[in-house]
Amino acid sequence: MPGALSGRRMLPSGLCLGRWQLLRTIRARGRGDPRELPSTPQVLCMKLYGNPKYHQALHYGTVEPQDEITVTYKHGLPLVTLTLPSRKERCQFVVKPMLSTVGSFLQDLQNEDKGIKTAAIITADGSEIPASTLMDTLLMTDFKLIINKLRYDIRCHKKEEPSGEHMTELENTKSLVHRLFTILHLEEIQKRRERHLMAKIDHLQEQLRPLEQVKAAIEARSEANTSGLLWAGLALLSVQGGALAWLTWWVYSWDIMEPVTFFLSFANSIVFFAYFIITRQNYTYSSLRSRQFLQFFHKKSQRRCFDVEQYNKLKEDLAEATESLESVRRSLRLRIQGEEASEKN
């Protein structure tokens, strides 16, 4: 082999030329023996040496990884392609940007693959995106999709910013479509909203029920303490009046006790004025009673771990939902009355 390889010349492209592969090879001219080159054409045969895989490794494919989530557009609609965790199959979801929301998209994922226990969408900086956000708004920027505690970075294609006239026309079209949809499906929308409000009211009442029980117990104790304090004040004033009468008629004379009663009345006026400066409220028995009741209530709430802010928030939400439900039912009644009147005519 070394002798055979010594007669071969390596070509730049990794090809090796063998002496046995030449047809009628031409020898170099010897000393004093010049020969002319033959006129017949020469055929050069080449043989490939080396590892062919080395050259094939330079070619790279464009196949996407199986676990990558991509967003593409087809016929103007976004296509979200991902791998289902249970079946390990690639699945495409067609997104309607103006109708689909983040919540409906996540629900579609869970309906398609029951192995998806948790799914959420967050922004690139980690802020959670509400379920009511439209997919059109979501696809404007990059975001992250969390499926069963696995995070996937999704990069969205940048869309060309439309002109001002196009945006105005698009907004007008959206408004027109929304009005037409509302007019054609008004009764269905109102009934759906009524069911939603009733479910919300039931949920709020369910949350308020244990809080109401704790609040009633705290109010009863606070009321008892406030009443006891008022009775103690009445007893103190009675003792003061009895002491002044005893000193006036049995111990001293009125001439001596008159200045004492005057300064006592003046001291009471100072106390009332100080109460106004501190509390910014007039000194009345009703305001004093309410203030003392609230003090007892908040102290006992802290001891019982009763969240007053949460209770007030739930009560406000319940009042708002009840008012909205009454408004929806009023609209439904007016609509039914109008239909009945038109049928009679």
Curated annotation (Swiss-Prot):
Pfam families tied to this protein: MCU
Top-rank taxon, per record: Eukaryota
Expressed in which tissues: Detected in lung, brain and heart, and at lower levels in white fat, skeletal muscle and spleen. Detected at very low levels in kidney and liver. Highly expressed in macrophages during the progression of skeletal muscle regeneration.
Disruption phenotype: Impaired macrophage differentiation program, characterized by macrophage inability to efficiently acquire the anti-inflammatory profile. Mice show delayed muscle cell regeneration through exhaustion of the satellite cell pool. Conditional deletion in skeletal muscle affects mitochondrial metabolism by shifting energy metabolism toward glucose oxidation.
Annotated membrane topology: Multi-pass membrane protein
Keywords assigned: Calcium, Calcium transport, Coiled coil, Ion transport, Membrane, Mitochondrion, Mitochondrion inner membrane, Transit peptide, Transmembrane, Transmembrane helix, Transport
GO biological process, one term: mitochondrial calcium ion homeostasis
GO cellular component: calcium channel complex; membrane; mitochondrial inner membrane; mitochondrion; uniplex complex
Transmembrane segments: 229-249, 259-279
Main location: mitochondrion
Main function: Negative regulator of the mitochondrial calcium uniporter (MCU), a channel that mediates calcium uptake into the mitochondrial matrix. MCUB is required to limit mitochondrial calcium overload during stress. Acts as a dominant-negative regulator that displaces MCU from the functional uniplex complex and thereby decreases the association of calcium sensors MICU1 and MICU2, preventing channel gating. Mitochondrial calcium homeostasis plays key roles in mitochondrial metabolism.
Family: Belongs to the MCU (TC 1.A.77) family.
Record-given protein name: Calcium uniporter regulatory subunit MCUb, mitochondrial
Biological source species: Mus musculus
